[in-house]
């Protein structure tokens, strides 16, 4: 099974715990703030902000929190200034890892990220060392139990999607990154429910992980990165057997 897909499933399952600790809200507030700073506070004219607000609402973030984050981004009220940084490196087994961060202290963040890589038999690399192995896509996940592949394919392509890929429990609807918001809106209008919708970095090729020790170190690295307050998203290109993945995820 694709480790990228499986890891996404694990992240969503642990998301309930993250929400209790406020991590999801913290990440969403950062995204809204940065989106508003870069493209203005009007979601109608700022697709990134519009997308961030939709995600925040799906996580039941209070409207006041959303409004305050937008105003911080536009400078109407005082707030932290976050830098967006993409860190790249290799995890155990030669797995490529991308780490998207938003931070108010670059030195602190890079020191922590480098430590996580080194601690788990990986190494933080230079800019561009692995990003070429990934392709930016809009990704909409749909539960297979809610719709047939043929029906979804017809609806998704009509909505402007590029392709539909089947996985163990989900369909992955792929879009041009700039078309994600439009495709998602068209699918919603057609009554298609989805599990998640986001801009993602999809691997062009995958690295097979068959060794249990390598797998443990890899998951520990990914979990450490995901749990860091400055990390927004983590992408990797590993592929792993379903049985081994289940053992490691326990």
From Swiss-Prot:
Per the record, the similarity remark reads:
Belongs to the TACO1 family.
What is the organism field in this record? Desulfotalea psychrophila (strain LSv54 / DSM 12343)
Keyword Transcription present in the record's keywords: the answer is yes
Quote the Pfam families the UniProt record gives. Answer: TACO1_YebC_N (PF20772), Transcrip_reg (PF01709)
The UniProt record lists the keyword Mitochondrion: no
Superkingdom of this protein's organism? Bacteria
- Protein name, as recorded: Probable transcriptional regulatory protein DP2908
Q: Can you name a GO cellular component term?
A: cytosol
């Amino acid at each position: 099974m694709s480790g990228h897909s499986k890891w996404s499933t694990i992240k969503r399952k642990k998301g309930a715990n993250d929400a209790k600790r406020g991590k999801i809200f913290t990440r969403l507030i950062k995204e809204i703030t940065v989106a508003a700073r870069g493209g203005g506070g009007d979601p109608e004219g700022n697709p990134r902000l519009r997308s961030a607000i939709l995600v925040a609402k799906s996580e039941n973030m209070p409207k006041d929190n959303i409004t305050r984050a937008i105003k911080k981004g536009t400078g109407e009220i005082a707030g932290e200034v976050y830098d967006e940084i993409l860190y790249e490196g290799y995890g155990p087994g030669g797995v490529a890892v991308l780490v998207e961060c938003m931070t108010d202290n670059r030195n602190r963040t890079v020191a922590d990220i480098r430590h996580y890589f080194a601690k788990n038999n990986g190494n933080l690399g230079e800019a561009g060392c692995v990003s070429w192995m990934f392709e930016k896509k809009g990704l909409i996940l749909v539960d297979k139990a809610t719709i047939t592949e043929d029906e979804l394919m017809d609806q998704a392509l009509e909505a402007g999607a590029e392709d539909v890929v089947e996985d163990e429990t989900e369909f992955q609807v792929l879009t041009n990154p700039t078309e994600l918001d439009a495709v998602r809106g068209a699918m919603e209008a057609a009554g298609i429910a989805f599990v998640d919708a986001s801009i993602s970095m999809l691997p062009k090729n995958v690295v097979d992980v068959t060794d249990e020790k390598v797998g443990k170190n890899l998951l520990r690295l990914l979990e450490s990165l995901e749990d860091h307050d400055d990390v927004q998203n983590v992408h990797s290109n590993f592929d792993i057997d379903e049985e081994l993945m289940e053992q490691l995820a326990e």
